[in-house]
Amino acid sequence: MKVLSDKQNEALEKMKNLAAELGSEAAACKQAGISQSVYTAVKKGTYTGDVDKQLAKVIDYFATKEAAAVLYAGTGYVPTTISSDVQKVIRNCQLQGGLAIACGDAGIGKTEACKEYSRQHSTTCVYVTVNPCIKSAKAVLELIGAQINVSSGSVSRLWLDITAKLSDGMVIIIDEAQHLTYKTIESLRSICDHFDAKGQTLGIAFVGNETTVNQLGGKQKAEFAQIRNRTKNTRIYSSKKVQRSDIELLFPDLVNDVPALEFMLRIAQSSQAVRGAVNLYSNAHDNGNVTHKGLVAMAKYMDMAV
């Protein structure tokens, strides 16, 4: 039986604590990147492979997490002008039923608004994010189904099971909706129609960049225009609409540093958007200098156009 070093024993103790935190040893092993069977054998002293190599994975995992813990972690959700308005669009969509669109520049708070709305309305909201690989009707229905415990099947079976599982007054948020195909949007719209026919409401909010309303589908642009005309609310947002008050909420430490605040507002209103401003502040914070001079220097280091 191999004698473990103090560092290796410490890693095993951290794994034990992580398992207690996550609720199972299996979850802890998956998160730390080590096979559960290997971990169990190492603990028991029966592992016949390279123990040092396996425990190095665990040691490196916790070292990475501990190093990351001291970095700037952000302020969590911040109700900026734009993110608050996106939430209003989603709320009205849920109350009225039917389709709604909230789109605009990347990095201005749309996704954070969706996540926050989903957290606040977890029992009546289904939130999914699509991507270039998940955009077909079946793939998106499977994504929605996974959120409400509907098993995969044919497109028709998925549609029927999902409509049976959803209930009056719910809302589905589709983030990164610019990736959706016309057929997928029609499949989703038909869910709204199904509830409307029963005298009930089901809202679907499409959230994404501006192509969500003016470029989706390429050659099928006219068909998407017809869908847009059937939406009850369409909002288009721009980084240029970011307010000084938003910057004060996002970076409260800068409230008394007017030059720094104005500089961050310029960044947020540019193509860098709010996300770029947050990244800049994060790097400057970790570098130990969030003064105006420090922020400008970091922006230059990051090759930001300012």
Question: Which residue stretches match the model-derived regions?
Answer:
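Conserved adenine-nucleotide phosphate-binding loops and their immediately adjacent elements
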Residues: E66-T80
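Sensor-1/coupling segment of RecA-like P-loop NTPase cores
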Residues: G104-A106, L180, F195-E223
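Conserved catalytic segments around the Walker B and adjacent sensor/switch elements
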Residues: S122-P132
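Mid-core helix/loop region of P-loop NTP-binding domains shared across ATPases and GTPases
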Residues: A68-A69, S136-L143, V150-S190, D196-A205, ...
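A short helix-turn-beta junction within AAA+ P-loop NTPase domains corresponding to the substrate/partner-engaging
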Residues: T123, K219-K240
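Pre-Walker A adenine-sensing motif
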Residues: Y77-Q94
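C-terminal alpha-helical "lid" subdomain
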Residues: M1-D60, Q226, N233, K240-V306
